[in-house]
C-alpha cells in the first residue's frame, strides 16, 4: 500500500494506478480499492480520469463503495464540462439517501430498501436514458423508491469534460468543497453507454469471485481506464465483500 501526495506526481501516479489495478485483477483473487481520506482545504483527495467521456444518451454507472461517516454530502462521481459543472453527479446525503444529477436537471433523490451502513461495502448502479428521461438507482441489487421519468429528456451528456472521483466539481477540475467530498472507499467503478437490465445489475451486486465477473464498462473500465491520484489517495488490494 502506498500513499501518493499532490498533483506534481500526477503522471507517475496514473501509471502506477493502472499497473496496480491490472496486476491485481490478473491474480484472480483480489481487486483494488481506492481510499479517500478526509478533505481539508487545500487538500482534496481525488482521482481524475485521463481523457474525457464521449457524447452519451444512455448510461449505466456502477461501483462498490464504503463510507466512514455520513456527514455533509458524500460525492462519489462528478463529470463537469465548461457549460455545466453538474453534467453527471452522484452523491449520498446525511440520511443515507442517494442523489443523481444528469445534465444539470433537477436532482433525482431516492430512498432505498437497503440502508447504508458505515464501514460496510455496498453496490450501487445509476441508469439514465435520454429517450424518456428515465433515471433509476439500485443499491445492493434492489431498486430504490423515487426512480423517475422526465429527467433531462432528449438531452445528451456532452464530451470534452472531466471525470473526478471523490469530490464535487463546481468548475472543471476545481472549486472543491470539503463538505462535498467522499470520506471512504471506492472500487470496481464501471460506466456503460447503455442501460443495463435488472438481471445484469443484480448480477453485478453479487459478491462474485473476480474471475467470474464478465460485465465490464465499455466507457470506463476499472482495470483499464487510467486515473491520476491527488492529495493523499491510498490504493490497496481488497476483497470487496470481505
From Swiss-Prot:
Annotated localization: Secreted
Binding-site positions, phosphocholine: 60, 63
**In this protein, which residues make up the domain named Pentraxin (PTX)?**
30-241
Q: Identify which cofactors the protein needs according to its UniProt entry.
A: Ca(2+)
Q: According to the record, which residues are glycosylated?
A: 147
Record-listed Ca(2+) 1 binding positions: 85-86, 169-170
Which GO terms label this protein's molecular function in UniProt?
Answer: metal ion binding
The record's disulfide annotation reads 62-125, 112-144, 207-241
The keyword Transferase is annotated on this UniProt entry: no
Q: Quick check: keyword Disulfide bond in the entry?
A: yes
The annotation note on the cofactor reads:
Binds 2 calcium ions per subunit.
**Record keywords:** Calcium, Disulfide bond, Glycoprotein, Metal-binding, Secreted, Signal
Q: Where is the signal peptide?
A: 1-24
Q: Which residues bind Ca(2+) 2?
A: 170, 180
Q: Name one GO cellular component term.
A: extracellular region
> Which SMART domains would you find in this protein's record?
PTX (SM00159)
Q: What does this protein do?
A: Might serve the role of immunoglobulins.
Give the family this protein belongs to, as stated in its UniProt record: Belongs to the pentraxin family.
State whether it acts alone or in a complex, and with which partners, per the record.
Homopentamer. Pentraxin (or pentaxin) have a discoid arrangement of 5 non-covalently bound subunits.
- Recorded protein name is C-reactive protein 3.3
Amino acid at each position: 500500500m502506498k500513499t501518493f501526495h499532490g498533483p506534481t506526481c500526477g503522471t507517475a501516479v496514473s501509471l502506477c494506478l493502472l499497473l496496480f489495478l491490472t496486476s491485481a485483477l490478473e491474480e484472480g483473487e483480489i481487486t483494488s480499492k481506492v481510499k479517500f481520506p478526509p478533505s481539508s482545504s487545500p487538500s482534496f483527495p481525488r482521482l481524475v480520469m485521463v481523457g474525457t467521456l464521449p457524447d452519451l444518451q444512455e448510461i449505466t454507472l456502477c461501483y462498490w463503495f464504503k463510507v466512514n461517516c455520513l456527514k455533509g454530502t458524500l460525492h462519489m462521481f462528478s463529470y463537469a464540462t465548461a457549460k455545466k459543472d453538474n453534467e453527471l453527479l452522484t452523491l449520498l446525503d446525511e440520511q443515507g439517501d442517494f442523489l443523481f444529477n444528469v445534465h444539470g436537471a433537477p436532482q433525482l433523490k431516492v430512498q432505498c430498501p437497503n440502508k447504508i451502513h458505515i464501514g460496510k461495502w455496498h453496490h450501487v448502479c445509476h441508469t439514465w436514458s435520454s429517450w424518456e428521461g428515465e433515471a433509476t438507482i439500485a443499491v445492493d441489487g434492489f431498486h430504490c423508491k423515487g426512480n423517475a421519468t422526465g429527467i433531462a429528456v432528449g438531452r445528451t451528456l456532452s464530451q470534452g469534460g472531466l471525470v473526478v472521483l471523490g469530490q464535487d466539481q463546481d468548475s472543471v477540475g476545481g472549486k472543491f468543497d470539503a463538505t462535498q467530498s467522499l470520506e471512504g472507499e471506492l472500487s470496481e467503478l464501471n460506466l456503460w453507454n447503455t442501460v443495463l437490465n435488472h438481471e445484469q445489475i443484480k448480477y453485478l451486486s453479487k459478491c462474485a469471485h473476480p474471475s467470474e465477473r464478465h460485465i465490464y464498462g465499455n466507457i470506463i473500465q476499472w482495470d483499464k481506464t487510467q486515473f491520476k491520484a491527488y492529495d493523499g489517495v491510498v490504493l490497496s488490494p481488497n476483497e470487496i465483500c470481505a
